[in-house]
Amino acid sequence: MRHPDFPVPPRIDAFASWEASLRLAFARRGGRTVLASCRHRGPLRVQKALYPEGEGVCHVVLLHPPAGIAGGDVLDIGIELGAEAHAVLTTPGATKWYKSPGRTAMQQVAIRLDAGARLDWLPQENIVFNQARPVIDLTLDLAPGAAAIGWDITMLGRHAAGESWQEGRIAMHTRLRCEGQPLWIESTAFDAQSPVLGATTGMAGFHVVGTLWAVGAGATEALAETLAEQLPYRDDLRAGVTCLTQDAPGRPSVLLLRVLARRPEDARALLSQTWLALREPIHGVAGRPLRLWAT
């Protein structure tokens, strides 16, 4: 059953062949962030809680043992961070979206942060196979005083294997909210023949796209301007950054960085570097490279 407090969108594929769900709850107990609750159904798991930064920050790796998502599959993830908790969540490798002519596969993630909670959401890239039809959905709801940094990276086609993305469709939906009120909402959907892939206002012929978002009191226009001075604009890697300020008092601003790349490694390296630079102004903690990715 879905947690009633998680704003998880309804399943859209009536022919789902494999459903998996995962529910995580983090809590602050004294000076320690703990994984207070973990429930799963189907092939979604987590490794044990790790503390490479000390007891205040809990690191967890999300595991999907099949290593790929096929047509009809639905992965349903709900995460809650209690007041003042700080969690870092990542994946051990790329998420592969397999060929599935005519059938949609879906991953939906709903995250809720209570007052003062801090989140680092750092999944590795999505790899969209030819003829895949993924729907990738993320909803993040923050209480006042909470902060979050996260990203998504998607590669269309398996170019290292000589396979381009010639057929299929992708839909990506992201909702960032504070107390249920929208801070930033983006919905993108196109097929493999869409002109957006080649348009200068779209992906400009690149096949890797990534977006980093940072939400919190430290997300300022001045910070965006500082980052902009260091971003590349080359034939193989391009990036830009902006800050969405909020009119309503008490609502956090959103810093957005977009990257286009030829290789997912380059996009991930740029977003990782940016994440390290953002941790101090957004979370008030030092940026440290993820040890999980070095093992």
UniProtKB/Swiss-Prot annotation:
Main localization category: cytoplasm
Protein name per the record: Urease accessory protein UreD
Pfam families for this protein: UreD
Function field: Required for maturation of urease via the functional incorporation of the urease nickel metallocenter.
Listed SUPFAM superfamilies: Methenyltetrahydromethanopterin cyclohydrolase (SSF56199)
Family of this protein: Belongs to the UreD family.
A GO CC term assigned to this protein in UniProt: cytoplasm
Molecular function terms, GO-annotated: nickel cation binding
Superkingdom of the organism of origin: Bacteria
Keywords: Chaperone, Cytoplasm, Nickel insertion
InterPro entries reported in the protein's UniProt record: UreD
Location relative to the cell: Cytoplasm
Record flagged with keyword rRNA-binding: no
Oligomeric form and interacting partners: UreD, UreF and UreG form a complex that acts as a GTP-hydrolysis-dependent molecular chaperone, activating the urease apoprotein by helping to assemble the nickel containing metallocenter of UreC. The UreE protein probably delivers the nickel.
Keyword Chaperone among UniProt keywords: yes
